[in-house]
């Protein structure tokens, strides 16, 4: 009734309450490339440990790779807060699954499939999780490597690189994997080491401190922080890019 006649001077009127709706319009603290390579008997994922605030190298010791369970690992580039949220949700899912006590756990493929639904659902609400995620695992004798981005676009591939790595590292990864049917664990490790060095040289948002995580039949192995041997002797010869 008061809405129809308007509010009298000095009279209070309560409008229907609704909280503000906030959307991630642009990411704040971000991580750059994540690399993933399948090898004979497992998968290797690598990412540096830098959280950039715009172009400022703000947080230099943060992990962007998580162990989901004994057969699945996950690496994320993009918004670090959204990655932390995803990590929290996945960790709780894994705990809930273990509490059932039926001897089953999430396979890499299941986590990948679930992530495609979450990412697509959030993008459909115009409030995406601003990440590109790489899922690796070894389950039932098979290596798995999958990609999901903030729109829910997903695929599986023998090599994956996100962010700037899609331009700089992916050609190097494909050059090796397309000429060999399968890689050994040592070959995959050397390849990833080389790509991380190239990314440090060429990507201004990267950092020379990184983690390399391997998943095989025997479980998950996390190495790091690691760093590459670098040589800047020829840097003064490179000009014209200022």
UniProtKB/Swiss-Prot annotation:
Active site: 24 (nucleophile)
GO terms under cellular component: cytoplasm; nucleus; proteasome core complex; proteasome core complex, beta-subunit complex
Keyword Signal tagged: no
Gene Ontology terms: biological process: proteolysis involved in protein catabolic process
UniProt keyword annotations, A-Z: Cytoplasm, Nucleus, Proteasome
Superkingdom to which the source organism belongs: Eukaryota
Compartments it resides in: Cytoplasm; Nucleus
Pro-peptide region(s): 1-23
Entries under Pfam families matching the protein: Proteasome
Transmembrane segments: none
Annotated CDD domains: proteasome_beta_type_4
Broad class of where this protein is predominantly found: cytoplasm
Function in brief: Non-catalytic component of the proteasome, a multicatalytic proteinase complex which is characterized by its ability to cleave peptides with Arg, Phe, Tyr, Leu, and Glu adjacent to the leaving group at neutral or slightly basic pH. The proteasome has an ATP-dependent proteolytic activity.
Subunit field text: The 26S proteasome consists of a 20S proteasome core and two 19S regulatory subunits. The 20S proteasome core is composed of 28 subunits that are arranged in four stacked rings, resulting in a barrel-shaped structure. The two end rings are each formed by seven alpha subunits, and the two central rings are each formed by seven beta subunits. The catalytic chamber with the active sites is on the inside of the barrel.
Entry's family note: Belongs to the peptidase T1B family.
Official protein name in the record: Proteasome subunit beta type-4
Native source organism of the sequence: Xenopus laevis
